[in-house]
Amino acid sequence: VVGIICSFIGTQIMGEFGPLVTLRIAIGSGTAFLVAQLVDVFVFNRLRSGAWWRAPLASTLIGSSLDTAIFFTLAFSASFVFLEPMNDVSWSWEVLPILGLGPEAPLWVSLGIADWLVKLSLALIALIPFRVLVSRLSPTTNAV
């Protein structure tokens, strides 16, 4: 809830060219965070009794995928111009090869994929300290 409120507060802070956080960014950010966080917790809870890595990895992959897809779609897709018609995000609709290599898609799709890859990388790296914590805090020494 705090993240959602902060997103909307940001729409009221004015910079040189208008609000520092546009309404579309605030809506996309708040919606993506809320949905992804709820799904992340649900998935983690359902998988927590399995292998040590399954719950954190699966919940993060699913939550991050939802967060990225919802945020970038609401914030930049031409389909959601009605959310804030005065905000020009047409720069994000330029059709380019995905990540500079693949088939062509709007720029915002590449930005979303890059964002998701960063989240995925961080999730994989974070498994190392998570494993250490689980093994040290676990009452049994036979962690799977």
What label would you give each PLM region?
Residues V1-G30, L34:
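Alpha-helical membrane segments and adjacent membrane-interface helices in multi-pass membrane proteins
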Residues V21, I25, S29, W52-P56, ...:
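Residue-level signature of transmembrane alpha-helical entry/exit and packing/kink sites
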Residues G10, S64-F82:
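Hydrophobic alpha-helical transmembrane segments in multi-pass integral membrane proteins
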Residues M14-P19, R48-G50, L99-A105:
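Helix-boundary and loop/linker segments of multi-pass membrane transporters
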Residues S49-S65:
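Internal alpha-helical transmembrane segments of multi-pass membrane proteins
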Residues A36, D40-V41, F71, L127-F130:
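Alpha-helical transmembrane segments of polytopic integral membrane proteins
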Residues S77, L83-V144:
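Alpha-helical transmembrane segments and their cytosolic interface
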Residues C6, L61-I70, D115-L124:
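Membrane-embedded alpha-helical segments of transport systems
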